Regions:
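Conserved catalytic motifs of the protein kinase core domain
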Residues: 47, 95, 190-192, 211
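Hydrophobic packing residues in well-ordered alpha-helices of helical domains and bundles
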Residues: 64, 117-121, 174, 264, ...
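Helix-rich C-terminal or lid/interface subdomains of diverse kinases
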Residues: 108, 231-309
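Active-site Asp-x-Gly
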Residues: 59, 192-195, 200-256, 260
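Short helix-capping segments at alpha-helix termini
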Residues: 24, 75-80, 167-168, 240
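Short strand-connecting beta-turns/loops that link adjacent beta-strands
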Residues: 91-93, 209-211, 264
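ATP-binding pocket architecture of kinase catalytic cores
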Residues: 30-148, 164
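An alpha-helical support segment within catalytic cores of ATP-dependent transferases
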Residues: 5-28, 90-91, 104, 114-115, ...
Length: 309
């Protein structure tokens, strides 16, 4: 396999200067710097108005090409901005790049989402459900089978014990999710919807007043279980805000609680794996995400889940 060169500032400047569609970004000496959030050097700020994303390997290149078309499909439906590409092509050996407009706002990891912002998230979830499955499949968006909450619960139990030994987590908190409850919260046999599948805080662009102005990172989108996006929002903005947004979008108790417990199990497992040196990610962020997912919500007091979704 050919080794992909790590992009440098000079690499990025040369590429940007060669792009006639980049306008101001392709000036004589564009200011370029790596986007530090996410810990990658394949994403670069270009000036103040653009961001350059470089595919690091072949599979990522395929997903980036698909993302360009998918963003055009979802843009009229989701109620928030998605990036627009002003130039795209190959930067090395069949590996794609896209120069996107930079959406104004701050990362959802550092900017709080307000109540009005929760309504923006509800519009996002509603719009995703309205995307034509047929059109998404025609773009190559894959289908993903729902995850087994019981299998995830079992894995989280072991992870919780390891966290308890490190004085990081009380494993008794997982007792609420009994095997029968996990079975009751299994994904329902309903038509798949478009799922962003990576709704973490750094992919939410939030304005100073707490409005969600844009959503980034569409490369992992699938046709599948909408509870996965509810789970992503629980980790990104907290369980109460995520459930309120999902409820506003028309989701009932079952998918909301399923998403809640997906997020809780995921965050326990990720933190435990990171402490064992088997995963990456900043420990403070992983602890913060665990705390968000485990914020209590009123819906947990429901003892008998309704049958409708």
């Amino acid at each position: 396999m050919t080794q992909v060169p790590t992009p440098t500032a000079d690499t990025v400047r040369r590429l940007v200067r060669s792009l006639p569609a980049a306008g101001e970004a392709a000036g004589a000496g564009p200011d370029v710097r790596p986007v530090t959030e996410g810990g990658e050097h394949f994403t670069w700020w270009v000036g103040t108005r653009h961001v350059l994303r470089l595919a690091p390997e072949g599979e990522a290149a395929v997903r980036r090409r698909r993302e360009l078309r998918l963003r055009d499909l979802v843009r009229p439906l989701v109620g928030v901005a998605v990036p627009t590409s002003v130039a795209h092509g190959d930067w090395a050996g069949g590996l794609t790049y896209t120069l996107d407009t930079r959406l104004p706002g701050r990362s959802g990891e550092v900017q709080h989402v307000s109540a009005v912002g929760e309504a923006d998230l509800a519009g996002l979830l509603t719009g995703l459900r309205e995307v034509s499955v047929r059109q998404a499949e025609a773009l190559g968006v894959p289908r993903a089978a729902p995850r087994s909450l019981e299998e995830l619960r079992t894995a989280a139990e072991g992870a919780a014990e390891r966290l308890a030994a490190a004085d990081e987590f009380d494993p008794g908190r997982l007792a609420q999710l009994t095997p029968p409850a996990a079975g009751q919260l299994a994904a329902q046999t309903a038509a798949a919807v478009l799922v962003h599948h990576d709704l973490k805080g750094e992919h939410l662009v939030v304005s100073a007043d707490g409005r969600v102005r844009g959503v980034l990172g569409w490369t992992d989108a699938v046709l599948g279980d909408p509870a996965e996006d509810i789970a992503g929002l629980a980790i990104a903005v907290g369980a109460p805000a995520a459930v309120r947004a999902a409820t506003l979008a028309g989701y009932g108790a079952r998918p909301c609680l399923r998403g809640l417990w997906l997020s809780r199990c995921d965050t326990v497992i990720r933190l435990a794996e990171r402490l064992r040196g088997r995963a990456e990610g900043p420990l403070p962020l992983l602890r913060t995400q665990l705390g968000r997912a485990w914020e209590p919500i009123l819906l947990e007091r429901v003892t008998e889940l309704p049958g409708d979704d």
